[in-house]
């Protein structure tokens, strides 16, 4: 047996940085490079950069600063109702920013959500699928009462009147 060809001995080569950098700058660059653990976290996000203002879960914000060993020990928890509500509000705010003028929204259907006091479990469980809360609210009478959605009739020409924030008709 030759000790030099042992399968346990693995040597990695580190690519050299540009020669015009001083050693201190090269060391700082090396330290800023992501580790495999941080790459796993960033792959779950929608963009390569982690913007702490976009992350609704405060627990995730705190885990980003932890070491990988500390992160391993933590168990994954489901978000609280307050966190779900903020995620839904953030999602609905993004939808309203990209919404068409009022005349065009009638053809797409009513996309109102529940009032802030009533939890909207349909869209909170799937915040990336717009309109699913409306479909589930129409099929479930209890949800219809909570969200103020009237059941659809067979008459396709009937539609709901727009309501203000207190629930009174605007027309």
From Swiss-Prot:
Entries under InterPro entries matching the protein: PPP1R1A/B/C (IPR008466)
GO BP annotation list: glycogen metabolic process; signal transduction
PANTHER family per record: PROTEIN PHOSPHATASE 1 REGULATORY SUBUNIT 1A, PROTEIN PHOSPHATASE INHIBITOR AND DOPAMINE- AND CAMP-REGULATED NEURONAL PHOSPHOPROTEIN
Gene: Ppp1r1a
Assembly with partners or alone: Interacts with PPP1R15A.
Modified residues annotated as Phosphoserine in this record: 43, 46-47, 67
Signal peptide bounds: none
Family to which the UniProt record says this protein belongs: Belongs to the protein phosphatase inhibitor 1 family.
PTM: Phosphorylation of Thr-35 is required for activity.
Region (Disordered) location: 1-171
Compositionally biased tracts (Basic and acidic residues): 19-29
Region of interest (Essential for activity), ranges: 9-12, 42-54
Keywords from the UniProt entry: Acetylation, Carbohydrate metabolism, Glycogen metabolism, Phosphoprotein, Protein phosphatase inhibitor
Region Interaction with PPP1R15A, annotated ranges: 143-171
N-acetylmethionine, modified sites: 1
GO molecular function: protein phosphatase inhibitor activity
Name this polypeptide is given: Protein phosphatase 1 regulatory subunit 1A
Function description: Inhibitor of protein-phosphatase 1. This protein may be important in hormonal control of glycogen metabolism. Does not inhibit type-2 phosphatases.
Keyword Translocase listed: no
Residue positions where Phosphothreonine is found in the record: 35
Residue spans of biased composition, Polar residues class: 122-146
Record-linked Pfam families: DARPP-32
